[in-house]
């Protein structure tokens, strides 16, 4: 449904500290590495040279801001409620302190709600503007959005994971399942959600 499409779009625009492989194993993404310091402290070394879609470089300040923003959000804080605080310990290191030992921390830090956002851009423009004009560090940047109709994404050449092979992604809202089937059969669509 709508949620799966929103998650698909978000995972193209944004990146998280961790990602989960097809086997369900957490792997570093925007984090270069991590280590558990004790039962309630996890250190993350942040990947250097990562760019947001506006060309600015991601910093540990953006990471702390993004996690603090998620904690403060009544909509998504359940994903990060285990976090006591985020401490910047170096130019590219942070320590996440948890309220108590929390085993699924790495998985939770791969959930799209924990995406790293550009602090200065969000603070300057506000949450409402950011929701309509998002920029992240993901493989695609949003170039056009027609609410209720379509979203057009374009490959981000400076993506830290390498330039995506597909140049453009267009996601269209097609309310009728039968129309989605026809779009697949005629080749108008490459992927369709909720066909049955």
Regions found by a protein language model. Give the residues of each.
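Short, well-ordered beta-strand elements
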Residues: 1, 5, 32, 41-44, ...
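N-terminal lobe/hinge region of extracytoplasmic solute-binding protein
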Residues: 1-38, 68, 135
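Extracytoplasmic
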Residues: 12, 29-31, 37-41, 58, ...
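Sec-exported extracytoplasmic/periplasmic mature domains
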Residues: 18, 22, 39, 51, ...
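Gly/Pro-rich hinge or "lid" segments in bacterial periplasmic/extracellular proteins
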Residues: 21, 25, 111-164, 168
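Aromatic- and charge-enriched surface segment that lines or borders ligand/interaction sites
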Residues: 32-74, 89, 95, 183
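Surface-exposed binding/hinge segments that line
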Residues: 35, 78-121
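Ligand-site clamp/hinge motif
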Residues: 156-196
């Amino acid at each position: 449904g709508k949620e799966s499409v929103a998650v698909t779009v978000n995972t193209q625009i944004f990146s998280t500290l961790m990602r989960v492989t097809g086997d369900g194993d957490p792997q570093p993404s925007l984090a270069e590495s991590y280590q558990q310091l004790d039962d309630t402290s996890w250190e993350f070394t942040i990947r250097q040279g990562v760019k947001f879609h506006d060309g600015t470089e991601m910093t540990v300040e953006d990471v702390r801001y993004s996690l603090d923003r998620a904690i403060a959000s009544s909509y998504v804080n359940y994903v990060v409620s285990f976090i006591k605080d985020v401490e910047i310990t170096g130019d590219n290191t942070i320590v996440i302190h948890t309220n108590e030992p929390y085993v699924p921390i790495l998985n939770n830090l791969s959930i799209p709600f924990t995406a790293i956002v550009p602090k200065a851009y969000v603070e300057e423009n506000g949450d409402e503007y950011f929701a309509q004009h998002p920029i992240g560090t993901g493989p695609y940047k949003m170039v056009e959005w027609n609410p209720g109709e379509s979203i057009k994404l374009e490959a981000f050449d400076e993506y830290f994971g390498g330039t995506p092979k597909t140049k453009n992604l267009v996601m269209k809202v097609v309310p009728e399942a039968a129309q989605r089937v026809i779009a697949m059969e005629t080749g108008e669509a490459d992927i369709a959600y909720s066909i049955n």
